[in-house]
Amino acid sequence: MTEVEEPEQPTTINEEYDLWVSNVPMMYDFVSETRLTWPSLTVQWLPTEMQPREVDGQQLLRQELLIGTLTTDNEPNYLKIAAIDLPENVTSSKPSVSDDAKENELSHRQSKIKIVRKFKHEQEVTRARYMPQSPNIIATLNGAGIVYIFDRNIKEKDHGAIASFSYHKENGYGLAFNPTVSGQLLSASDDGTVALWDVTSTANKSPSQTFDVHTDIVNDCKWHEFQSSLFGTVSEDNTLIIHDTNSDRAIQKLSVSSAFNTLAFSKRSENLLAAAGTDSNVYLYDLRRLQKPLHSMAGHEDSVTSLEFSPHQDGLLTSSGSDRRIIMWDLFNIGAEQQPDDAYDGVPELFMMHGGHRSPVNEFSHNSNVPWLMCSVEEENVLQIWKPANKIVRPPQPPADFDITTLE
């Protein structure tokens, strides 16, 4: 009798994680994993002085980041500032040590984070962002759509928010400080509204402007990196809208077949915009011709949850997803020729895939001080800090004749 081959069983999440752990010495210069008491829906590196200090004969550099809590009804919530002490060789651009040496040193690199400050917070922290012009000022958004402002300069223990702003009627996940105008803060809500606040005037509790152009949940809002009055929003009403604070009307509107969850404006090219959402693809757009994407990138297997352009490397875009993956995309490799074996691993612009999470990724952040240093949080209480190995990360360099607008 002919033997019937049993179908190959799919790899379990824990088996995938074990495989990732086995590859850490080859793929990373640093990995730290911390199980938090409560999940954090948000994470962002804080700008920190690059001044190493000696601890037990080792030069360490402290970096700090923002996280929040999502607790049960009976437990208090907090905005937290976490810190991690990194070895000097992790924060420099020196060549990676050999794989054998890294395997021996890896246990010493598993630095755990420490909570160095926490602020009482009403309800869960859905988003937390620092003000670029004054990083001690931190804004949060909670489960009721209320915006809170905190000041790190106030040192009293158990100090709470210095101001709160109420306009939204529901939960929200969109929160963004204007990178070019101090004190301007956008918030977006599940009630379909977007509000603009002046956080330098805490006596005024009303928004400076409101934008009611969406007909469903607003998933995200982001400022343009160069033009101070422009920002974008994406919504469950299947639209991406470009707004101008000088007008109450949308200046551009794109309708799509499936909703975008997130968007990001390029920090280097003023016309480049990325957006992604429920169909798992990442789309690139030219603001001058918004109605048709320049290019779409496939790599995620579930909804994309967040997007961010690198503050250091031109052409590097990062995305996270409900598929437990974080992908770094090298836009300069779009259209590059591939060998058949390489094509099996993904499209040519898929630069690196971080597979260390075991549940959907809520958010991630690029460190503004240390190139390639990342932090990310997942649904199951885990915070990871990681840096790809120097031997595999090379600043993406565009060909001399490369033009992002020719990708149509």
Swiss-Prot record:
Keywords: Chromatin regulator, Cytoplasm, Nucleus, Repeat, WD repeat. GO terms for cellular component: cytoplasm; nucleus. Residues 341-345 are annotated as: Interaction with the histone H4 N-terminus. Regulatory subunit of the histone acetylase B (HAT-B) complex. The complex acetylates 'Lys-12' of histone H4 which is required for telomeric silencing. Component of the HAT-B complex composed of at least HAT1 and HAT2. The HAT-B complex binds to histone H4 tail. This is Histone acetyltransferase type B subunit 2. The record marks L272 as: Important for interaction with HAT1. The keyword Repeat applies. Disulfide bonds: none annotated. InterPro entries: G-protein_beta_WD-40_rep, Histone-bd_RBBP4-like_N, WD40/YVTN_repeat-like_dom_sf, WD40_repeat_CS, WD40_repeat_dom_sf, WD40_rpt, WD_repeat_RBAP46/RBAP48/MSI1. It comes from Kluyveromyces lactis (strain ATCC 8585 / CBS 2359 / DSM 70799 / NBRC 1267 / NRRL Y-1140 / WM37). SUPFAM superfamilies: WD40 repeat-like. Its main location: cytoplasm. GO terms for biological process: chromatin organization. It comes from the Eukaryota. WD repeats lie at residues 120-160, 167-207, 213-253, 255-295, 299-339, 356-396. It is found in: Cytoplasm; Nucleus. Gene3D superfamilies: YVTN repeat-like/Quinoprotein amine dehydrogenase. Belongs to the WD repeat RBAP46/RBAP48/MSI1 family.
